Amino acid sequence: EFRTLYANVKGTTPYCVKKVAVLNCWGKMRAWGCHMVHHALYQKQNYSYAGIIESLSGAPFDVVFINFQDILDNPAILDDIDVIINVGDADTAHTGGEWWENPQIIESIRRFVYNGGGIIGVGEPSGHQYQGHFFQLANVFGVEEETGFTLGYDKYNWDEHEHFILEDSEEVDFGEGKKNIYALPNATILVQ
């Protein structure tokens, strides 16, 4: 049946709504398998993230996998992308670790967002303790992680706000979630 279906589509590319780039340290090298290890055995550290990659496979998106070196070699690679996804725990190959110390990476992604590109972070995206921040894109995401360095800072931005994006949604379920994440003062909180 697969061969018949393949013959019928004649190599035609399906309609894609947007182009989505999964950003990690592997890029194309581990495309579609970036949250699986050792023949997809269950791993507590990454099983929560595998569903994100899996959901992309059935969505009407043109999905590409890029790494940080791709951005350094050709910052224009982001010009053709609508949304970047950075998924995983901090300081891992999933999210980038020390790559976030490179100002060209930060500048390229901030420019991408400033020019209307979307970015989705799940887990600890851009998470790497450096220059007084844990999330290197804290000002883009509007959140920071408490790692003990800012315990004495006031963190009073807890009020939730209504937003059209949640109007027809059921209760938001974040799954396991991450602890010690707080909103920055000017961030608009939709759900905690």
Where are these regions (language model features)?
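Hydrophobic targeting/anchoring helices
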Residues: 1-51, 149-159, 166-177, 190-192
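A short, well-structured beta->alpha microelement
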Residues: 56-75
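Short acidic/histidine-rich motifs immediately flanking catalytic phosphotransfer sites
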Residues: 77-84
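A glycine-rich, often tryptophan-bearing local segment used as a flexible ligand/cofactor-contacting loop or short
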Residues: 96-175
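Alpha-helical scaffolding within the catalytic cores
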Residues: 4-8, 69-75, 104-107
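Short catalytic/ligand-binding loop motif for oxyanion handling, primarily in non-cytosolic enzymes
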Residues: 29-32, 72-73, 93-94, 127-133
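The substrate-binding groove and active-site-proximal loops of carbohydrate-active enzymes
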Residues: 35-45, 86-102
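A glycine-centered loop/beta-turn motif at secondary-structure junctions
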Residues: 15-20, 26, 32-34, 58-59, ...
